[in-house]
Regions:
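Alpha-helical transmembrane segments of integral membrane proteins
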Residues: 407-634
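Gly/Trp-centered helix-boundary motif
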Residues: 1-141, 145-155, 159-429, 433, ...
Length: 634
């Protein structure tokens, strides 16, 4: 009998011989390299992906309003990849735009009114011949509505029907501050006068910006970035306090800004105002998509005060009040206030919706300001902490974001984590279905008779069923009964319908093997059925097991992706099929076009194709080595 050491040496020798043959196969090495790369990505996904794949949140444990569980979105919906800013053909910067309109007039109840028709709806050959009613069917706009955001109007020109061109003065047209895209004409022009508006607009790729570097005031140096002013500056002292800040986590520092009012002499005749300013540069020609402001404060010596959040344009000198909040707190506890650009009160205070279009019309220097307003009767102390402002841009991450609500997802993180589901489902389904097929094929081929007939007829029954429609029905039924479908349910279903072809192949090989002389000799020597199967039959069919394992994985990967794409996957896990499902349900294809957001769908499709092809290449390489009819003689 061979010793354990001899068996180990023989196994190592066989593996070395197999590896020497396998490494000579270029497609086999290429395929196994891809599988190793995807396996590495799947194993180390938490370290490679910058965000969780499901409901990623920004600021958890960083702001009082968010606490230790809630968070803000990591980015705006449908953000483009951040590397778009390096593409030379993507337009960026200030652009000069020209838009044309044509006028016509109508008299209603004795009053002459002027209307305009956009250039794209005006036909110089037919429109002038239309009646007033027919022109009204084209457009009844009484003002010029520009298609792009306006940073500055350059000129407004009128070309009369007789060919005379006149540049309108500032007194002959005007804009309402809350509607910068609309121009109202003063004079009434003859019908079919061509109005040309030349204006500047900014087009840019805007990154997320965190305005305040240290919003928790971890060190005293963080106060140096702030400046302050007051209408009673001689009674105000602004300092750093290292003990009375907010501690949401054990690792948090206790720093904060302390604002002290010293009552002295004559009481103030008007409310005391203290404004803290944090200067920053906004480098983009286009406004941010959204902004969010957070301030936490508490008071000692006064229970009622007001707090304002504002932006101040250092270049134009214009101040934009975002929100004013009254704070009434009998006990000296921190109270937080947050401001979101989507709030109606912000648009109302700024005078434009969305408010960021007016606040950040182009690049420039700004200040983020927080103002305390109070009526003191004695000494008062205020403490400010978690003071910050976030500006959301339109580019984010390596692959951008989707449009999931309320927490948009980082597509690169979803792609990385999706490799886990595809590999687990593909490999486990292949292993389970292959070994079930091996077991049933061995039993059917070697035992024969009624057992063979029952197994094969059952396999035939499953083979003739339409698999994908059946998968859909079974998955839907499981979801209806349990409320959700798990990854393990999908593996079970794919395994149940994936063993039949391999079982038939094993059966045919066993039927041939059991007629061989060495099997007859083993029977004559008194070998039991299990001994013959284990020692003589299985080693002769196991080469087919390796090949089937490799070639079965792609089918399972694609089927899982198909089910997830139809919305029948595990919604609690990120998968490549789920990425396709969310893209399909987003409506982006019809509203924006496939090519504009290719980065949402194409990487997942390419990943599925590459991983499936890698297993197929490995399967072909194994077939060349293990199949005697294809094996190269060297």
């Amino acid at each position: 009998m061979a010793t354990r050491e001899q068996k180990m040496k023989f196994a190592i020798k066989r593996f070395k011989g197999f590896w020497n043959q396998f490494r000579r196969s270029k497609r086999g090495i290429f395929g196994i390299s891809i599988i190793i790369i995807f396996s590495f990505i799947a194993i180390f996904a938490p370290y490679i992906a910058p965000y969780p794949p499901i409901d990623p949140k920004y600021g958890v444990g960083e702001y009082q309003a968010l606490g230790l569980a809630s968070g803000k979105p990591i980015a705006t919906k449908l953000s483009k990849p951040i590397w778009y800013k390096y593409l030379p053909w993507i337009p960026r910067g200030e652009q000069i735009i020209q838009e044309k309109f044509y006028t016509y007039t109508g008299t209603y109840y004795g009053t002459t009114l002027q209307f305009v028709i956009p250039y794209e709806k005006y036909d110089p050959n037919t429109t002038p011949l239309l009646t007033l009613e027919e022109k009204n069917n084209i457009s009844v706009a009484d003002r010029l509505t520009l298609s792009r955001r306006v940073s500055m109007i350059e000129t407004v020109e009128a070309k009369l029907p007789n060919g005379t061109v006149k540049e309108l003065s500032d007194e002959e047209w005007y804009q309402e501050p809350q509607r910068p895209r609309e121009i109202i004409l003063g004079p009434i022009f003859p019908d079919d006068t061509e109005i040309t508006v030349t204006y500047k607009t900014g087009v840019d790729l805007v990154e997320n910006m965190k305005i305040v570097t240290d919003h928790k005031f971890s060190t005293s140096e963080s106060l140096d970035s702030w400046t302050w002013s007051s209408n009673y500056a001689d009674r105000i002292e602004v300092s750093y306090n290292a003990e009375k800040g907010i501690k949401l986590k054990e690792t948090d520092d206790s720093g904060c800004i302390q604002i002290s009012y010293k009552a002295a002499g004559t009481p103030p005749t008007e409310p005391v105002q203290v404004t803290l300013s944090y200067k920053f540069s906004y480098p983009y020609f286009q406004p941010p998509e959204r902004f969010w402001v957070h301030v936490s404060s508490k008071s000692e010596g006064i229970s009622r005060y007001y707090i304002e959040a504002s932006f101040y344009n250092e270049d134009s000198g214009e101040k934009f009040l975002l929100k004013r909040a009254e704070i009434y707190t009998p006990s000296p506890e921190y109270v937080y206030k947050e401001v979101d650009s989507t709030e109606d009160v912000v648009a109302s205070n700024v005078g434009l919706s969305p408010p960021q279009d007016r606040i950040f019309p182009t690049h420039g220097n700004y200040s983020f300001q927080v103002t305390l307003i109070f009526n003191p009767s004695t000494n008062v102390n205020f403490y400010l902490d978690h003071v910050d402002c976030l500006l959301y841009g339109n580019i984010f991450g390596l692959l951008g974001t989707d449009n999931t609500t309320p927490y948009t997802k980082d597509l690169f993180s979803s792609l990385i984590y999706g490799s886990r589901v595809s590999l687990i489902v593909g490999v486990l389904t292949a292993i389970f279905s292959t070994f079930i097929g091996l077991f049933l094929g061995l039993i059917a081929g070697y035992v024969g008779g009624v057992v063979d007939e029952v197994i094969m007829r059952f396999a035939d029954l499953l083979l003739v069923l339409p698999t994908l429609p059946l998968f859909i029905v079974l998955v839907t039924a499981l979801r209806a009964s349990s409320g959700y479908i798990s990854m393990w349910n999908i593996i079970f279903i794919l395994t149940f319908f994936g063993w039949m072809s391999f079982a038939r192949s094993v059966r045919s090989m066993v039927l041939s093997l059991k007629e061989r002389a060495f099997i007859e000799a083993a029977k004559a020597a008194g070998g039991t059925t299990m001994h013959i199967i284990n020692r003589h039959v299985i080693p002769n069919v196991f080469a087919l097991v390796y090949i089937t394992l490799a070639t079965s994985v792609p089918g399972a990967i694609i089927t899982e992706a198909s089910l997830s794409w139809l919305g029948l996957g595990d919604t609690r896990l990120a998968s490549w099929g789920k990425i396709l499902y969310e893209f399909n349900n987003s409506g982006v294809v019809t509203s924006k076009g496939l090519l504009e957001y290719w980065f949402w769908v194409f990487p997942a499709c390419i990943a599925i194709a590459i991983l499936a092809a890698a297993f197929i290449l490995v399967g072909y390489a194994l077939d060349e080595i293990l199949n005697p009819r294809l094996r190269e003689r060297r």
